[in-house]
Amino acid sequence: MNSAYHPPDMSQRIPGPAYSSSAPPPIHTYQQHQHPPPPLPPPSQHHHSSHPPLPPPPSAPHPHHQHPPPPPSHSLSSHQHHGQPPHHQPQPYAPAPYQQSQPSQYPRPHPHQQHVPPPSQHDEPPPPPSSGPSPTDHQKDSEYVPPSYSKIEEGSGWKYSLDVKQQPVRARMCGFGDKDRRPITPPPCVRLVIINTETGKEVDYNTLDHAMFVLSVDLWNHDEPGTPSYQQQSLPPSRESGYGQSQGMNYGQDYPPPVQQSYGPAPSYPPSSSYGPPQQYYPRHSGYSAEPSAPPPGAPFRNGYGQDQNALTRMAVVGGQPQGMFTRNLIGSLAASAFRLEDTEGQSGIWFVLQDLSVRTEGTFRLRFSFVNVGRPGGQGTNVNQGRAPILSSCYSESFHVYSAKKFPGVCESTPLSKKFANQGIKIPIRKDANIKGEGDEEMYDQN
């Protein structure tokens, strides 16, 4: 019984002397631990013998918890030099009561676990990439040019491609009236290139029959590849519109909206996921219901309107009847015939000139040109193809801007190519020299 009481007494004596300055004091204390008989030699405590030297050094418990490794190294080394291995075994008996509070505290302050700054370094890299690529992405969008498309014609083995020699630059919006139409300047001029796949050279354009060559054009947004240009309209949020879907779009409303919203450019072509050969699309008017209906499950929506995957059509409803008509954003001569013309270098070729194109709304757009041969393959005769005529080539123009009447800087000067074609009989508006006529800054045109 007396031997059982001695261990707590000895533990109280240990923190009293300060042996941090010299090694002998700890040896004296360990000799005192030998006097009490070791009636309890459990092996479990013997494993803790490596850790008990840690508690004696701290005079203040809290500051020394963070530095457990140094004391054990000095204490163990001192014991080994003095050659007292037996004193090293009875150590767990004295600090046993002190260990009851320590085991839970030792695993926490391990210095290796306190090095948390490395994760902070991983947090720093994410901000730079998020801020860095944003300007580069804008530059890529501005420099991006949609790819062109070309196809080899079956039967003839000719490969057709389009080359936009004269790009559109700017235009003035003409609104939704037809009285004040302003064409795109300069007029786009597209050259048709035909290569014989057998020889790898261009064909002789002087002997080629181009009467059945047709070029169509449509308007596309410059920053949204794969979507046609159209103007979105939305009703006030207080109005509840019905939904319905079939081949086109059905709308039903409890009360009619204002007539002003019935006018506006609507899409004329279905959107596609990527640039490719265009397909002509004619919107179909579907039924209209006066009672609102719920949208079908899984149907996508945009601005509160149901949207079909194959077509984008919108129509305002007044009293359950269609009030407005579909309106193109691009108006004018949307198809052009081919001409055999000479360029400024005197080389003959097949050209398409689109001098009568106007845009209703302001913005930045692109033109897409699509070439079709409606005649027999290979130019065999002038018979019209009674079946389907595939699109043999398509390309996109550079982006151009359409200004409002107040912001419009003026039409572009007539280019040498436009003047060259005008001299050959193509009706292109040519801007006359104002100084000769004495009209000042007034713009004058000569319709050839």
From Swiss-Prot:
Quaternary structure annotation from Swiss-Prot or TrEMBL: Component of the heterotrimeric velvet complex composed of LAE1, VE1 and VELB; VE1 acting as a bridging protein between LAE1 and VEL2. Interacts with VE1. Forms a heterodimeric complex with VOS1; the formation of the VELB-VOS1 complex is light-dependent.
InterPro entries the UniProt entry points to: Velvet, Velvet_dom, Velvet_dom_sf
Bias kind Low complexity: ranges: 15-34, 96-107, 260-292
Principal location listed in the UniProt entry: nucleus
Family designation: Belongs to the velvet family. VelB subfamily.
Record's subcellular location: Nucleus; Cytoplasm
GO CC terms, sorted: cytoplasm; nucleus
Velvet domain segment(s): 155-431
The protein, known as: Velvet complex subunit 2
UniProt keyword list: Cytoplasm, Nucleus, Sporulation, Transcription, Transcription regulation
GO terms under biological process: sporulation resulting in formation of a cellular spore
Ranges annotated as biased composition (Pro residues): 35-44, 52-61, 116-132
Annotated region described as Disordered, given as residue ranges: 1-153, 224-306
Disruption phenotype: Suppresses aerial hyphal growth,reduced colony surface hydrophobicity on solid media, and increases the ratio of macroconidia to microconidia. Reduces the production of fumonisins.
Functional description taken from the UniProt entry: Component of the velvet transcription factor complex that controls sexual/asexual developmental ratio in response to light, promoting sexual development in the darkness while stimulating asexual sporulation under illumination. The velvet complex acts as a global regulator for secondary metabolite gene expression. Component of the VELB-VOS1 heterodimeric complex that plays a dual role in activating genes associated with spore maturation and repressing certain development-associated genes.
PROSITE patterns reported in the protein's UniProt record: VELVET
